[in-house]
């Protein structure tokens, strides 16, 4: 079962839309480092070269060890998963294990034969990335203007086959708010469950591109307003959009795990992405529990209790905040990416001071 992390009462500070029930885990597996595009925001700085997880390793080692670590939901990522020569065989192995799987793709390398085969498996759904809805925005942001037409056409084919699940988008300075109205309408017309939008972050290639390509706050607010009328047709998931009033969501590290193509296994992908940035005061090894190709990871994950190791919100600002008791303190990875140690405020998401500072009673004149 999936558990929603995006709720009306809290700002959506975590990069994930859903988690899993207590006692279960969700795993994202980077089956390849390789990608045919060169996206300005890529968390793992993918290029056309890199490591693949071998089919034998994936089927005989990775998947069984993930199952023994209580993984009940799986996402295949990259790089570009369709660049992996054995994607279909990997998905067939998950079907034999009765393991639901999502594929996150740029939808530029998928053949009709692959779509037919994936649809026949019955356990696969696909999330497609759209970073704008024009060649001059999506295509340019992804390093190939021609990619937009291919992605749009392939997404239609995914939908026709019953495979399309969600649309993933990173608003940026190349996009215009009305594009997201068009994108959400497109998603709704195709029967997508949701459109997830999150800003360009300082992870991977985004460290260098953030300053010149990140969408400003005014644009993010305009996108939220432009897409709001579509909320009755498709679920809108604005991640880390400007927050005016709400306490922050919390961190599910240890439940939402990540396997890198070399087998390194993380308690959260974003903590490792952030720790690998030049500004990080934390080392990536703090968030790695071992290598799944070398041995079992279930016990190491069970022993790793993020909130016992680190105290989020351990700072005067949070302690004095009026919403402290109901606040999850936001995303520790975002704190690290901002050059701070875990425990500092997630200032990018904190509501304004007028909300955070408690009112001080004014004594009456006769007191």
Where are these regions (language model features)?
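Short glycine-enriched, charge-decorated loop/helix-capping segments at active-site entrances
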Residues: 45-52, 140-146, 210-213, 337
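Conserved C-terminal portion of the radical SAM core fold
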Residues: 69-75, 97-102, 123-127, 149-239
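Short, small/polar residue-rich loop motifs at catalytic or cofactor-binding pockets
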Residues: 249-254
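Radical SAM enzyme core and accessory elements
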Residues: 1-21, 262, 273-287, 310-367
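C-terminal accessory region of radical SAM enzymes
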Residues: 216-244, 271-320
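Conserved radical SAM core fold
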Residues: 36, 81-83, 107-112, 124, ...
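Conserved alpha-helical substructure of the radical SAM core
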Residues: 2-125
């Amino acid at each position: 079962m999936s558990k929603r992390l995006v709720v009306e009462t809290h700002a959506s500070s975590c990069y994930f839309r859903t988690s899993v029930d207590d006692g279960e885990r969700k795993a994202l597996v980077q089956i390849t480092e390789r990608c045919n595009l060169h996206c300005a925001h890529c968390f793992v700085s993918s290029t056309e070269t890199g490591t693949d997880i071998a089919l034998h390793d994936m089927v005989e080692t990775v998947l069984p060890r993930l199952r023994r670590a209580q993984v009940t939901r799986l996402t295949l990522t990259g790089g570009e998963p369709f660049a992996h020569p054995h994607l279909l065989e990997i998905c067939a192995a998950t079907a034999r294990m009765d393991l639901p799987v999502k594929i996150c793709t740029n939808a530029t390398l998928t053949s009709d034969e692959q779509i037919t085969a994936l649809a026949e498996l019955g356990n696969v759904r696909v999330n497609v990335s759209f970073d704008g809805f024009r060649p001059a925005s999506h295509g340019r942001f992804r390093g190939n203007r021609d990619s937009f037409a291919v992605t749009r056409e392939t997404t239609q084919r995914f939908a026709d086959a019953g495979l399309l699940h969600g649309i993933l988008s990173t608003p940026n300075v190349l996009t215009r708010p009305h594009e997201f109205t068009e994108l959400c309408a497109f998603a709704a017309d195709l029967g997508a469950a949701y459109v997830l939008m999150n800003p360009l972050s300082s992870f991977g290639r985004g460290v260098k591109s953030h300053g010149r390509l990140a969408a400003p706050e005014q644009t993010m607010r305009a996108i939220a307003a432009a897409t709001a009328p579509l909320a009755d047709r498709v679920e809108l998931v604005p991640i880390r959009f400007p927050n005016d009033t709400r306490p922050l969501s919390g961190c599910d590290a240890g439940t939402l795990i990540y396997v890198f193509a070399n087998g390194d296994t993380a308690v959260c992908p974003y903590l490792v992405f952030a720790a690998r940035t030049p500004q990080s005061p934390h080392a990536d090894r703090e968030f790695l529990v071992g290598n799944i190709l070398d041995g079992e990871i279930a016990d190491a994950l069970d022993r790793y209790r993020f909130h016992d190791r680190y105290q989020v919100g351990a700072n005067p600002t949070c302690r004095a905040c009026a919403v402290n008791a109901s606040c999850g303190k936001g995303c520790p990875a975002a704190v690290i990416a901002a050059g701070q140690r875990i425990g500092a405020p997630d200032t990018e998401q904190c509501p304004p001071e007028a909300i955070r500072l408690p009112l001080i009673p004014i004594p009456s004149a006769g007191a």
